[in-house]
Amino acid sequence: MAELDGVWNVKRLGGLLPPLIGVRKVIHGNRGETKLGPVPGASFDVVGRSLRYRAPFTGFVDELEPDGERYLGLATFRGRQFGRFAMERTGD
């Protein structure tokens, strides 16, 4: 989904997510990665507005909804929500 292409800063809004300081999502086409600083991160497939994580994180899915210039996300595991976050595009 081209509208998601780019580098996004991630901010925790609530739930069981840890503080997300330094966390970014890098998306290109139908693939992406959640990264913490320079460390390689968790890979995912983009399916519509869902980010479906690959092994070893199979079962984790981020569901995104547009909110102006940003996206609001629900972090889920096997269909159960455990956290909320926002994604804002970086200047990169």
PLM regions: where:
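Short, compact, well-ordered microdomains
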Residues: 54-92
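Contiguous, well-ordered beta-strand patches that form the walls/edges
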Residues: 16, 29-70
